[in-house]
Amino acid sequence: MILTGKEIQKRIGKDIIITPYSEKQLNPNSYNLRLHEELLIYTELPLDMKKPNLTKKQIIPESGLLLKPGILYLGRTLEFTETHHLVPMLEGRSSIGRLGMLVHVTAGFGDVGFKGFWTLEISVIQPLIVYPGVEVCQIFYHTLEGQITEYTSGKYQANQGIQPSMLYQDFEK
């Protein structure tokens, strides 16, 4: 089952931590998260799964930044989230999708116990000017049945910013 907005609000500070939190971003069954001003762009193509891939930092100015099709932009949420006893999931807002912007490729599913900023895998299907602080996605929460084992040791746990792919670490095992 998915938590209602009222239930999300009731669990803030307990099972759900969102920092900063604003009641204005609460929806009937989700909470809107905003785009941070920093993006990362991979600088060498093709990308290689077996090694770290280089990136460059791009800041989105207040006046906006033109995103172009065919480029993967890694962004992050402005909000830090932490979730216990629930499964957090992320989805793009419909208003963003209607402009041709995708906020994740496949990583909209979080683990129980995840804490950190959400890295967004941003792409656009037509040129689009984006702005820092815009509400680009929404987080919602599923309840669980059965014994819970929280996510604690993953590559992306307790991150402090945008996380490029660390898939190469899987090859080192």
UniProtKB/Swiss-Prot annotation:
Q: Which family does it belong to?
A: Belongs to the dCTP deaminase family.
Query: PANTHER family attached here?
Result: DCTP DEAMINASE
Q: Which gene encodes it?
A: dcd
A GO molecular-function descriptor: nucleotide binding
Q: Which CDD domains match?
A: trimeric_dUTPase
Task: Tell me what organism the protein belongs to.
Answer: Leptospira borgpetersenii serovar Hardjo-bovis (strain JB197)
Which terms are listed as keywords in the entry?
Hydrolase, Nucleotide metabolism, Nucleotide-binding
Q: Where is this site: Important for bifunctional activity?
A: G108, F109
Q: What is this protein called?
A: dCTP deaminase, dUMP-forming
- Function per UniProt: Bifunctional enzyme that catalyzes both the deamination of dCTP to dUTP and the hydrolysis of dUTP to dUMP without releasing the toxic dUTP intermediate.
Keyword Transferase in the entry? The reply is: no
Q: Tell me, what is an example of a GO biological process annotation in this record?
A: nucleobase-containing small molecule interconversion
Reaction catalysed by this enzyme = dCTP + 2 H2O = dUMP + NH4(+) + diphosphate
